């Protein structure tokens, strides 16, 4: 059976619990049509680049699916009917990635906290270069230095 990565966006005003219920319902649709869902990832609420149906944010969820095309068509049909789902994207892939997806890794990297102070290194200051006023002025270009053609 073909492998798919499926991402859907749920409205910002639904709770994370309701998104889990949606995910469970969509898994049931896939399994009822002879497929299986390998991995699910909830990426959380993220800001959208542009508004979709008056929503500025959305819950993002990824499903790794192993199912026939008919199951995917039924899943997408169910999601188009559901008012809580804003957008869907299904991609056919050669193989599923092992481990967390790039979005989940990015979120983990962002959760590592502040960098802290500079310790004994002190303030960066001017780094020994001085200000602009310390630099010598550039010579003004002359007519000869433009490389223009001479008039005959």
From Swiss-Prot:
Pfam families: Ribosomal_S6 (PF01250). InterPro entries: Ribosomal_bS6, Ribosomal_bS6_sf, Ribosomal_S6_plastid/chlpt, Transl_elong_EF1B/ribsomal_bS6. Gene3D superfamilies: 3.30.70.60. This is Small ribosomal subunit protein bS6. NCBIfam families: S6. Keywords: Ribonucleoprotein, Ribosomal protein, RNA-binding, rRNA-binding. CDD domains: bS6. The keyword Mitochondrion does not apply. The gene is rpsF. Belongs to the bacterial ribosomal protein bS6 family. Residues 96-152 are annotated as: Disordered. Binds together with bS18 to 16S ribosomal RNA. GO terms for biological process: translation. One of its GO terms (cellular component) is cytosolic small ribosomal subunit. One of its GO terms (molecular function) is small ribosomal subunit rRNA binding. HAMAP family: Ribosomal_bS6.
């Amino acid at each position: 059976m073909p492998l798919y990565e499926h991402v859907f966006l749920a409205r910002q005003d639904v709770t994370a619990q309701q998104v889990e219920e949606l995910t469970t319902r969509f898994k049931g649709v896939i399994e009822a049509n002879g497929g299986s869902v390998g991995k699910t990832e909830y990426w959380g609420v993220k800001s959208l680049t542009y508004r979709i149906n008056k929503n500025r944010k959305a819950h993002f969820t990824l499903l790794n699916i192993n199912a026939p095309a008919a199951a995917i068509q039924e899943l997408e049909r169910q999601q188009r009917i559901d008012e809580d789902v804003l957008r869907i994207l299904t991609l056919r892939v050669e193989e599923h990635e092992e481990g967390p997806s790039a979005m989940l890794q990015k979120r983990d990297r962002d959760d590592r906290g502040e960098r802290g102070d500079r310790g004994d290194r002190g303030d960066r200051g001017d780094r020994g270069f001085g200000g602009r006023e310390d630099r010598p002025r550039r010579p003004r270009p002359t007519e000869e230095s433009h490389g223009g053609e001479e008039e005959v």
